[in-house]
Structure formats: C-alpha cells, structure tokens
Amino acid sequence: MQVLDDIEFDEKLRIRKVVEGWLWNENLLYDVFSSHILTANRIMGCSFRTGQGRIEYNAKFTRRHDDKQLAELLKIEVMRIILKHPYTRRQEGIRDDASVCASDVTIVQNCRIGDVGSNEIMTAETFNIPKGYCYEEYCKILTQLFSTLPPSESV
C-alpha cells in the first residue's frame, strides 16, 4: 500500500471530488476513471499520466491548478484512455514526445476543454501546425518537426 504525504493526500481528495461530480454529469469519464487505480507518482514531470491500469498524479504539479483546471487536466487524461493514445495507438518510427504532443493536440481540438492554466497541454498553435488532422497524422508531423530541432529545444 502506498503511503501518501499530506500534499498527496489532499490532492487525491481533490481528484476524487472531481470524479464524484462526473458520476452525475459525465458518466463515461466516471466509468473509465473508476476502472483504473489512482496512484501518486513523485518522479514524473507532469500532472497526470496513465498506463497499466493506473492513473498517476504528481501532487507537486496538480496543486498548481485550481479545481476547474485540475478537472480539465484530468478530463484530458481520461480521454487519452478512451482514445487509446498515445500508448496503445503508437506507430513504429514515431518519437515518444511526438506521440504525447499529438495526443494533446488531437484531444484539445476535438473535445470541449476549458482553461488548464499551464503549458502542460500542447495545441496546434503551440507548434504552428495546421488544425484538423487525426492523431496518427499529428504523430508524423510532430516527429518530423521534432527531428529538426536541437535536443535542447525538443519537448
């Protein structure tokens, strides 16, 4: 069993409050979230990450967001599970960072997402690329774009 510090415990309660609201308003998000285990991860460099039946959160990042922003970031992460990207739909030859950014771009332009208050979530405007492509096409576009950047400028 994972031992949480006070900040991690408080953030877990905030996340649970968001999810409880989904029970009445966003049944699909609630059901998908409920099929995963919520776990604190102190090492990762973002608010949320999913994989292997878990939704991980880093309290150092989640606490920077107000409740509405936290809800939007969590919604994006659950949408990744529903859409099976970036992990399950990863294509051969696609960079990891490009697939994560392509997931952001696709979700933000196709789902109703409010302000997340940070630069954690990338948009087509972030990279000055056209809108309207599917996830797989954005993976290719961003892999090509990132391969032209020096390592210090890569995402």
Task: Map each language-model feature to its residues.
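Short, functionally important secondary-structure microenvironments
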Residues: M1-E72, E77-V155
